[in-house]
Structure formats: C-alpha cells, structure tokens
C-alpha cells in the first residue's frame, strides 16, 4: 500500500505585512536612539552627566523629561570643558552657536562645575525640539535661547571659580572612600564617581539646589 503525500502550500507573507513590520522596526530604532552622556531611568526620565577631564568623577547635569533635552545639556557641558576641540556632539548644528555664547570669544575660560550645570540646564531648556527653528514665547523662561544662555554665563562670574587645571581645585581631591568629591573641604554632591550609580537612584538631584 502506497501512501500519498499531500503537499501543503506555503503561506506567503503579504507585502503589506512585511512592510508594516519593517516600518515598526525602523520606528522602534528611531525611538531608541542613543545620545552621548544620556541614560534612561526605569521610570522614564532621562539623566545626563559628563566625565570630568582626566578623572573618574562625573559632573551631574540633571534629570529631564526627554532624551533630546538631556543630550543638549551634555553638549553644553562638553563645550564648557573642551571648547572648540569638543567633538562627537549630539547636535553639532546647535552646539556651534552655543559655543560662541558660552565662551564669548574667549577660548580660555575655566568654569566651575556649578557654572557648567547652569549652562547645561539653560541649553536643555532653550528648545524642546532640536529640529524646530522656532522657540515658544508663551513661557517667560524660553524667551530667547541666546539671552537665556548669556544670562547664565554672566551669573557664573559670581560663583567661586574652580579652575580645571589647578591641583587645589576639584582635581586630586577625593576623600578616603573615593565616592564623593570635595572642593576645598566642602562636599560637592554634583561630582560623582562612575561607581556611584546608587547615589543617583536614591532620587533625582534637583539642579537648582546648587544655585
């Protein structure tokens, strides 16, 4: 007795289903775009921080509602630290004009960590959409990105200036546990080591607490 085998036709995926799956994959990759100096908290907020030059410590730049805002904060901080030599910026087209505002034509400005935080916060709030050329005027805090950043940088001259190149400043001033930085004997919670992620998870450090 010979058994006859019946061939079952293979199901061909429709072009519409394949195109929809590819589009969903591409949209998912867009949503998950990664920015330098930015990471996402488990509850959805985005935090930004930047490593201090030649150190294990990081400067805390704040917590933001969008990844783009946190990325702009990182760009501003990187320009404060490295000036015109800064590369690998998240938004080079925005950061070019930001560099001139921060330095005001001077490439040798040393800024304290607190001043860097202020400039980063102003850059993050300057525009809610990097691709948008207009800024909403409904909020008094967003009147003009240039004016906001100029005011922030001008205020920094009243801060205690901590040079990034002097040994008496925030270089080589770790405490015994290598967990926090101290500036002239004063604890500086906005400077953290790369091993202190638990410090951040205790709760957001509100940027304006240091103003």
From Swiss-Prot:
GO terms for molecular function: DNA-binding transcription factor activity; transcription cis-regulatory region binding. The keyword Membrane does not apply. It holds the Pfam family AP2. It comes from the Eukaryota. CDD domains: AP2 (cd00018). Residues 1-32 are annotated as: Disordered. Coiled coil: none annotated. Residues 13-29 have a biased composition (Low complexity). PROSITE patterns: AP2_ERF (PS51032). Keywords: Activator, DNA-binding, Ethylene signaling pathway, Nucleus, Transcription, Transcription regulation. One of its GO terms (biological process) is salicylic acid mediated signaling pathway. The keyword Nucleus applies. Residues 34-92 bind DNA. It is found in: Nucleus. One of its GO terms (cellular component) is nucleus. Probably acts as a transcriptional activator. Binds to the GCC-box pathogenesis-related promoter element. May be involved in the regulation of gene expression by stress factors and by components of stress signal transduction pathways. Belongs to the AP2/ERF transcription factor family. ERF subfamily. This is Ethylene-responsive transcription factor ERF014. The gene is ERF014.
